[in-house]
């Protein structure tokens, strides 16, 4: 039975802004929180974006990371008469939450990310002096380029994609929905320093322990067209696994300082990173009705890939990836590119590198650290400006795409590669959103914004303590 958004929320007895709505079904359908190791310390280090205690499993012979079950992103503008007072109050609220929950999936992950508008409006002089600099982008353009720049529309983005201007985005992750609800209450109901602009909710994992799998069950419950076609046990609405361990950047690789791509004046932002946030709808029905399994595999990975029927988890290690020459040769031969293959031309290390802390990163190592999650928001769970954001009543399959890269430009290089615009300057002759372009034929990006994630020590109103 197809349920409207209103009916789903009415069935929970709570409102959109205060409750989780349809996402309360996650715990019922998943059968509780995933098994996690109980022998863990607090899990919090210098970085905000890293989460300790993530479960590792083997699926189809491939190591896979199982992310926290529940996710929420809240965007907001700053409402503060005194930044000094606001900083103290926010830090006290965060300390309260961290004393209550460890920084693990079983506890609570909290990541504060700050947008360009915050730095321009509240700390412009301090930002001009101390914002991290993207050395690679600066060298290419011949001018100084900040590691954080405004988001742009890409070739395959619709003209109506909204480039957002939020001051802050707060990412909350936990296996326990109650922990996220508690953090939401503390940070946005009790604390008076933010005005919410949107709430974005969703889930991850839930497809590796047998049975139908969480994405399929949730999509069916929401009445998503084509939901019954989602393969049982899938991690994502589109059927394939995306959290292969070797497909995600390891530990500190996305930190500003790790690869030498970005420098941080006076070291203020060392231990920080860049975060891109976007919402993308997925046409599940078109994906399964118009693409046979073989074409789905070639679209998701690369043309010519040989997978057994029904395979969902595909190796993505350094030996299984594609470079620019591979992608160009394949395109010349087949007229198409695969999603993963195209991305890998920019998202993987072209040579072995030694990090600032001595860590050796082999050639082919992934750089981006993704934290995206499935959603039925359309496009958000709640918006302060529903008309502008295009809020719709019916749930829609999609993803809130959250990814950590060393800089805005590093993210953009990878996203352009998805459109056939490779890092070496090659632009493949692909019609935007065509089937030749991989997933783009069935994806539509509604919103985008870039953010800077400070290290934990500077997470509360960064640079504001330097104002005089």
Please name every model-derived segment.
Residues 7-468:
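Long, histidine/aromatic-enriched segments associated with O2/redox biology
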Residues 1-3:
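N-terminal secretory signal peptides
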